[in-house]
């Protein structure tokens, strides 16, 4: 089998993300070794940005 379209069908077999040990969300990338939600495995600090929360009346709420 080559590297083109036939091999793309093999991508859906293994799990990309598993449950994270720190945040509990289903966002820990097995291949890269870090969580996409909280940043576990990449940094000690929890990944959190202000744009993750909705703004109401020009004031950012949690």
Curated annotation (Swiss-Prot):
UniProt-listed InterPro entries: Ribosomal_eL37, Ribosomal_eL37/eL43, Ribosomal_eL37_CS, Ribosomal_zn-bd
Residues binding Zn(2+), per UniProt: 20, 23, 35, 38
GO cellular component: cytosolic large ribosomal subunit
Zinc finger residue extent: C4-type: 20-38
GO molecular function: rRNA binding; structural constituent of ribosome; zinc ion binding
Cofactor note: Binds 1 zinc ion per subunit.
Keyword Protease: no
Protein name per UniProt: Large ribosomal subunit protein eL37
NCBIfam families according to UniProt: PRK04179.1
Cofactor(s) of this protein: Zn(2+)
UniProt keywords, alphabetically: Metal-binding, Ribonucleoprotein, Ribosomal protein, RNA-binding, rRNA-binding, Zinc, Zinc-finger
Similarity-based family: Belongs to the eukaryotic ribosomal protein eL37 family.
Cited function: Binds to the 23S rRNA.
Gene name per UniProt: rpl37e
UniProt-listed GO biological process terms: translation
A Pfam family reported for this protein in Swiss-Prot or TrEMBL: Ribosomal_L37e
Record flagged with keyword Acetylation: no
Protein's organism: Staphylothermus marinus (strain ATCC 43588 / DSM 3639 / JCM 9404 / F1)
């Amino acid at each position: 089998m080559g590297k083109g379209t036939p091999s793309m069908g093999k991508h859906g077999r293994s799990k990309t993300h598993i449950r994270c040990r720190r945040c509990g969300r289903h966002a820990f990338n097995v291949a890269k070794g870090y969580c996409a939600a909280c940043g576990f495995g990449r940094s000690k600090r929890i990944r959190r940005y202000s744009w993750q929360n909705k703004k109401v009346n020009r004031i950012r709420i949690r």
